[in-house]
Amino acid sequence: MIKPNALKKGDKIAIVSLSWGGLGDAGLIHKYYIAKDRLEKDFGLTVVTMPNALKGTDFVYNHPELRAQDLMEAFCDKSIKGIFCAIGGSDSIRLLPYIDYDVIHDNPKIFMGYSDTTVSHFVMRKAGIVSYYGPSVMCEFGEYVKMFDYTKEAVEKLYPLFSSRNGS
């Protein structure tokens, strides 16, 4: 198994919606902006959002091939060092026919998500890279008035996602 390089301040991460597209819905899009701000300010990351990630529930559901395309493009982009999932859902299994395992294997990156994203973790396993079952953009990074301290601590210290940050 290939362990991707840890993230460091200034690294670019991609947000993908591999299952449910709710993060792009009018009533939830504000969580994207909260999460983006926290990922950039609290973790020092540069956030890019893949082209189809915020197109909403119906579009994302109807286009598994475009969800997979977003994932493949994120793996192909050498400037992207990590991929964080917007949220889980119920149908990421529909991406499987569109996955290129060699692309993933040849371009290892930090990959994190949970719930229905478990299917994508199996994809990473089949491609031979370590992935992380952890916080999603919509819930943990984009919820509440303040991110829970334990979420930040888990991401920074418990998961080996980040290189050492000044002793933290």
Feature annotation, model-predicted:
Residues 130-168:
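Conserved anion/nucleotide-ligand pocket segment
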Residues 99-124, 130-137:
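Short, acidic/small-residue loops that bind anionic groups at enzyme active sites
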Residues 20-23, 87-92, 112, 117-119:
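Gly/Ser/Thr-rich loops at beta-strand to alpha-helix junctions
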Residues 74-98:
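Long, hydrophobic/aromatic-enriched structural stretches that serve as scaffold segments
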Residues 12, 77-81, 101-107:
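Short, surface-exposed connector motifs at secondary-structure boundaries
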